[in-house]
Amino acid sequence: LDEDGIIDYSGYQRISARFKTDYQARKWLKVGINVGYTNSKTTSNPNIGTSGNSTNLSYYTNNIPPIYPIYVRTYNNGEIAIKTNETTGHPEYDYGTTGAAYTGYPGLSRPFSQTGNPLGTNRYNRSWSKGQQFNATATADIDFTSFLKMNITSNVNWGHSNGTSYDTMFEGPKQGVRGELGKSQNDVLRTNNTQTLTYTDTYADKHNVNVLVGHEYYKTETKYLYAY
């Protein structure tokens, strides 16, 4: 799977594989295994959120009045044009404030969502997440007699993810600190083991007896690291 997102500079890639089989080792013993693996990569933006503010691109574009510009404008050779940064050549986005950490140009501050311009941050800021997941389930069914049976099931689920977020040094809220880079790592290991013993029998063709005895053990280990 390799798809671009609805928003520019976003997308998702995934590779999955699965193997499943069972084997009748003996008349009284049947074993099986089910294994799955997934490798994925998500590309998005660290400033895209779901709250009602400028980090939400849909909210921002639907609610900002059209009189407010996306870019900083300049008057050049008798024409109004988009101003470009003299150092990088990038078009300069209007963040609705005169703060030095943003455009630093004199003028009026925007009353709607000052310091926000998700179109600008979406172009230069990035967020990557790479993940791996492994899941395996092994089973064993043992028939001691026609009425006494045992099932053993063990499951292992391992997940690993690496995250990277970058806020540009060229403009926006992280310009004043010369940009920001964040790294994260998350590891989760879950194990689950169950053993059940089932007794089923019928007496005098009238009375049915069904007894189930079981034991379950579950464990989760999580390790997380974040730095910027």
Named regions from a protein language model:
Residues 1-2:
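Transmembrane beta-strand segments that form the barrel wall of outer-membrane beta-barrel proteins
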Residues 6-7, 22-133, 151-228:
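Surface-exposed loop/interface segments of Gram-negative outer-membrane beta-barrel transport/assembly proteins
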Residues 148:
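An active-site-proximal structural segment forming one wall of the substrate-binding cleft
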Residues 12-18:
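Transmembrane beta-barrel architecture of outer membranes
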Residues 136:
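A cytosolic small-molecule/anion-sensing beta-strand core signal
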Residues 143:
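Functionally critical loop-and-helix segments that line ligand-binding/catalytic clefts
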